[in-house]
Amino acid sequence: MEKRSKPNGPRRVLLLTGASRGIGHATVKRFSAAGWRVITVSRQPFPEQCPWEMGPEDHIQLDLGDPVATEAMIPEIRARLAPDGGMLHALVNNAAISPKGEGGARLGTLAMPADGWLRVFQVNFFAPILLARGLVDELARANGSVVNVTSIAGGRVHPFAGAAYSTSKAALAGLTREMAADFAPRGVRVNAISPGEIDTSILSPGTEKIVQEQIPMRRLGRPEEVAQAIYFLCTEASSYVNGAEIHINGGQHV
């Protein structure tokens, strides 16, 4: 039976990066429905017309592309966790960037400028480990879980995802295994989910061809299907799952 956070009891707490749309938005809804407190991280300030039942105390404005600011924010995040016993039950590293060229063109290894590579890796790769390492005590206190969001583009050359994005996701998959080995003795599980073509606002023209030619299920994935897998990895249902990367792509990877 699924455990829920009780209204008058200890709340489970999720820290989620990249919550404004798509997979992140669906993840907020899935965890909130189960009674979790969800703290979001974004470059943008807390929106006045927030679509969720949360206040400014559950939003952290942070540019994950700034490594100094990211590390400096750790004490503030800890302070936000204090009302819940200084416990963090789940960290989901969902935020990512994938710059495009003129007219939305894919940026390959020869086209992406050096500063673009650095920023992509800072947001997609370094920020996840900076947050997880900085909050390891809070995660350990709750026997928590970390979920890194990788991508099918991390395992193959993708027609739309840029080279920097793809290699950063491949690196994040490797980081997930390393973290799983290092964090597990502290009681913290670390896993990844690897989405394929998901029906979000960032789909590129030509995705329909991929759906028809490469995906055995012949459809796009839904954000809520990804959110459900993330939720699974953050609950007791996956209590012996550690170091895994779950492919959510309708069989596109086979």
Task: Kindly label every feature range from the protein language model.
Residues S20-R21:
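Conserved glycine-rich cofactor-binding loop
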Residues N143, A184, R189, V241-G243:
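Short, small/polar-rich loop/turn modules that mediate ligand/substrate recognition or access, typified
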Residues R222-H253:
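C-terminal substrate-recognition "lid" of short-chain dehydrogenase/reductases
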Residues E102-L118, V211:
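Substrate-binding pocket helix/loop in short-chain dehydrogenase/reductase
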Residues D137, A181-D182, S239:
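Alpha-helical segment proximal to the catalytic Tyr-Lys
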Residues N94-R106, G251:
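Conserved NAD(P)H cofactor-binding loop of Rossmann-fold oxidoreductase domains
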Residues S98, G108, P113-A114, S145-A171, ...:
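Catalytic loop of short-chain dehydrogenase/reductase
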